[in-house]
Amino acid sequence: MNDAMNYDRAAQSAKLRNAVFKGIVYFFLAIWALIVLFPFYWMILTSIKSYGAYNSEYIPQFITLKPTFENYVDAFTAVPLAKYFVNTLIFTVATTALMLVVIVPAAFAFARLNFRGKNLVFTLFLALMMIPTELVVITNYITITNLELRNTFWGLILPSVTSVFYIYLLKENFEQIPDELYYAAKVDGTSDLKYLLKVTLPICGPTVVTVTILKVIECWNSYVWPRLVTDDPNYFLVSNGIQEIRENGFGRENIPAMMAAVVVISVPLIVLFLVFRKKIMAGVARGGMKG
């Protein structure tokens, strides 16, 4: 009898400790969620404040009683934001597609094929990750200028069609596929390209999707490189448009209109993440496993 009572007390105590622990964890997670989401809230809040109301606030107000959508109109009328949006879409899709054409075969070659100097070449590839981005930007700018590709889509796209990090990530995932599958496919007369398309990519699909989404986000948020190689408005991206809206052509900073533009151009990325979030999580989880 006493043993049963002691067991019940121990079980209740364990449940209580578990509940308290979960409560503490959820409390800190809620605080962290508020910290992460607050910039988005502030961005949306600023976008619906009038220019006068925003500049008259000596103390920032966390709500607005007179919301306005005038800033969204200004964002599209002050600059040709719709055209910049299309340019960004072309740049993002083309760059991501070309990158996949380059990095997928490269990762497969390092993961599955045997050739002389493979380890040395891959080590040199990894060493490239140690080079600061600023140095690469300078070299790329000189190259693109010498090739007379400034103010062209090719000038925007070509420096971004490869990534050592993504090659490394895909290589590690491709190596997780059992060797027996590859040898069996070769016995059946399957070419390396067909094996890559029919076996490797379907198995590692979540990781490929993750790499694709990360590249899309990277291209969509590009700022430094487009500012360097484009001074023709016909090739401006949304990042250029936001900078133009900030000044608005009147020698003043129109922050509410700029925030409205940021909200508009952030929507595609948010939707993309929500649609593919399960694939992204699966790709990240697979990338963290070995063997």
Residue ranges and their predicted role:
Residues 3-8, 13-17, 21-291:
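A structural signal for multi-pass alpha-helical bundles of membrane permease subunits
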